[in-house]
């Protein structure tokens, strides 16, 4: 089951591999952007992909959307997403009373107006500000425009260990891989980055018989050369 204000799509079980991403100190290059009308392939500089605003949009023209997903109805509940300048916060509860073996709560940040794709294929690293008070691991997914891949949960993911305090983590694009159940046609990180519509972050840890609070934040997202 999945609840969102966007069209319904299937959601994937978490990957087994967990990436220990490097926490970056915020630097002066964080404010750099590619010139208007260009894409990441044309710019060697760091590029800001999304800066959450207090109204749920991003400064770059995208939007942040929260949703929940579960194997069985009633095992996950999401609260309204809260926003402040630079940060989106997702909260809720995962409680597999009905037997779900997978499920979670997610924030999806669309990067451009109308869900248009951008080319971040020249980037080597996704820098993303994250925090989690409810789980030490968050799943980050690169999402593209292919509906079949999106609905099957076969865009690539990286599992990132995070702290309760908001920090910027450097996640190598090469570390994003498709879930194990996806076929050979599922894209890896570089291919997904070349046609990127959204970045999805999820707390997708389910423990049988355990009720758990979810509380995580997503901040600025950047592509680094």
Q: Model-derived features: where do they sit?
A:
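Bacterial N-terminal signal peptides that target proteins for export
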Residues: 3-18
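Beta-rich carbohydrate-recognition modules and glycan-binding surfaces
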Residues: 30-225
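Residue-level signal for mature regions of secreted extracellular proteins and peptides
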Residues: 22-23, 147
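C-terminal motif of bacterial Sec signal peptides marking the signal peptidase cleavage site
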Residues: 26-28
């Amino acid at each position: 089951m999945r609840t969102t204000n966007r069209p319904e799509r299937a959601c994937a079980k978490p990957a087994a591999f967990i990436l220990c991403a490097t926490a970056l100190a915020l630097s002066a290059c964080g404010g750099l952007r590619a010139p208007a009308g260009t894409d990441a392939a044309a710019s060697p500089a760091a590029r800001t992909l999304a800066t959450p605003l207090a109204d749920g949009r991003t400064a770059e023209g995208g939007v942040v959307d929260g949703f929940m997903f579960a194997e069985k109805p009633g095992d996950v509940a999401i609260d309204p997403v809260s926003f402040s300048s630079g940060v989106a916060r997702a909260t809720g509860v995962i409680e597999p009373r009905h037997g779900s073996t997978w499920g979670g709560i997610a924030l999806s940040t669309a990067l451009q107006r109308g869900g248009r794709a951008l080319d971040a294929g020249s980037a080597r690293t996704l820098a993303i500000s994250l925090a989690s008070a409810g789980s030490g691991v968050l799943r980050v997914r690169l999402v593209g425009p292919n509906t079949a891949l999106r609905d099957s949960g076969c865009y690539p993911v990286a599992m990132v260990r995070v702290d309760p305090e908001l920090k910027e983590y450097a996640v190598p694009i090469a570390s994003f891989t498709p879930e194990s159940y996806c076929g050979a046609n599922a894209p890896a990180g570089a291919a997904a980055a070349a046609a990127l519509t959204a970045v999805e972050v999820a707390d997708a840890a389910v423990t049988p018989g355990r009720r758990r609070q979810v509380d995580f934040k997503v901040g600025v997202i950047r592509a680094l050369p």
